[in-house]
Amino acid sequence: MKKLNKILLTLSLVLCLGGGLLIGIGAFAGGIDEAQEIAGARMQHYDQEKTQLDEFSAIDAELAICNLEIRPSDDEHAYLEYHIEGTREKAPLHVSVENGVLQLRDENYTISHSNVEQILTGFLWLLPDAERESYADGGGIILYLPPSTLTSVQLTLAMGDLSIDGLQASQFAADIALGSLDLTNTTLGLSEIDLAMGTLTGDNLTFNGVATIEVSTGNAELTLSPESNDGLLIDANTDMGNITAPESYGGDLLDTDDVVANHYRRTPQGTPTGNLSINAEMGEIIFH
C-alpha cells in the first residue's frame, strides 16, 4: 500500500497549498466581491472569424486559460478563428508563422501564473456570473488543418480542454495541467502526452511510432484504429485503477506488488506497428 499512501499524501498536500493560495488571494484583494469587480472590469471578449493562415509544417502553442480545437479543413489551406476572453489592455492571442512553424501564444497570462495579478484575472470563478457564462460559451480557439502530415506538433495548456480531429503528425507532444484531451481520427508518430488532471479519450486512434502517455488524475479511454488494433504493442500501468481490454487483443494482466495497481501488456504477432506505454496514477485505462 505504499503507492496509495504516497498518492493520498500528495493529494492532501496539493489541496492544502491550494487552500492557502486562495486565502492569500482573498486577503490581498480585499475579499471575493472586490476581486470579482477587478477581474470583470478588466476582461473583454475578443472574436476573430475564420481567417486563412500562411503555410506551415509544424505547430507550437502555449496557452494558459483557453480551449483549443483542431478540425479538418474543407480545402488545402489552414485557417484560424477564436472567440476568447482577454484583458482590455491588449489582444489575448499572438499568432505568427515563422520558418514554417505556426506559433500561438497567450498574451495575457504566463503558463505558470507567477504573480497575483495574473491569478486574479485568470481564475474563472473570480469573474461575475455573466462574464463567466460568456467565457464558457465563447468556444476558444479553432484551428482548421488540411489533410497533410505535420512534422511536429507541440501543445501546452495550463487550463483548458484540447480536442483534435483528423490530425497527422510525425512528432506530437501535449501537456495539459487542468483539462481533458480528446483525439479522433488521429495518426501520431513519436508522441508524448502528459495530463495532470483530466481525462483522455481517443477514437480511431493510430500510433505508428513510440508513444508515451501519463495521466496523473483521470481516466484514459481509447478506441484504436484497425492498424493499431492489430499491430500495436501495449504496456499499460495504473497505480490506483482498473485496466480493461477486449479479449481479442490477446493481452494479459500481469502480477504486481501492489494490491491497488494493475499492469497489462499486449505483444502482437509479427513486427509491431507502434509502441504505446500508458500510465494512469489515479484512474482507469479502458481499451475498446
What are these regions (language model features)?
Residues 1-6:
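Positively charged n-region of N-terminal signal peptides that target proteins for export
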Residues 7-26:
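Hydrophobic membrane-insertion alpha-helices, especially the h-region
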Residues 26-107, 140-146, 150-152, 161-167, ...:
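Short linear S-[DN]-x-LW-Φ motif typified by the pepsin-like aspartic protease active-site region
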Residues 64, 96-98, 158, 177, ...:
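Structural motif
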Residues 113-134, 247-266:
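Acidic/polar low-complexity surface segments
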Residues 153-196:
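Right-handed parallel beta-helix
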Residues 183-288:
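Short, surface-exposed interaction patches in beta-rich subdomains
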